[in-house]
């Protein structure tokens, strides 16, 4: 939030000056990439709305040939997860689900009651024991999961390596990088 407090766009009267605005935003800090991305996305969304067209049309892209992206379902109650899944299931080809709590299996069963779309998992470093992580990955594979992101705490590099070697699914690092 501190980064966003630095952003003052009053000097720009035209939101279509995307390159100038985003260069200014980028110059405010060498880091804060998530906050910069939020400004970038909001600005592009505004311009798209002003033009009355989605960006794939503005850029002349064929939506059917555009690479897929995921819709992320965060950690929440089963009712909220069910509602979010229903909301996005017909608009995305793959879901990304945040796990790493005691009710992980319940969350997956809730999603599976709504859709059979492929699912990528981000365990958010939530599985502390490597055998538990591996057991979860085997169970998740049976549920149509296609990949696992950051299953264990980033400090447990040896355990992450062990899980990665044993896993029937691809395992990716995030916080470990």
Whereabouts are the PLM-identified features?
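Gly/Ser-rich oxyanion-binding loop with an adjacent helix/lid
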Residues: 43, 57-59
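Flexible hinge/switch segments at interdomain interfaces of large molecular machines
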Residues: 17, 59-65
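Metal- or metallocofactor-binding catalytic centers and their adjacent structured scaffolds
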Residues: 1-50
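Acyltransferase donor/substrate-recognition loop-hinge adjacent to the catalytic core
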Residues: 60, 86, 109-113
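Active-site beta->alpha loop and helix N-cap motifs at the rims of alpha/beta catalytic domains
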Residues: 49, 53, 63-97, 101-105
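Conserved active-site and cofactor/substrate-binding residues in soluble primary-metabolism enzymes
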Residues: 16, 20, 30, 34, ...
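Catalytic core of soluble alpha/beta enzymes
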Residues: 97, 102-177
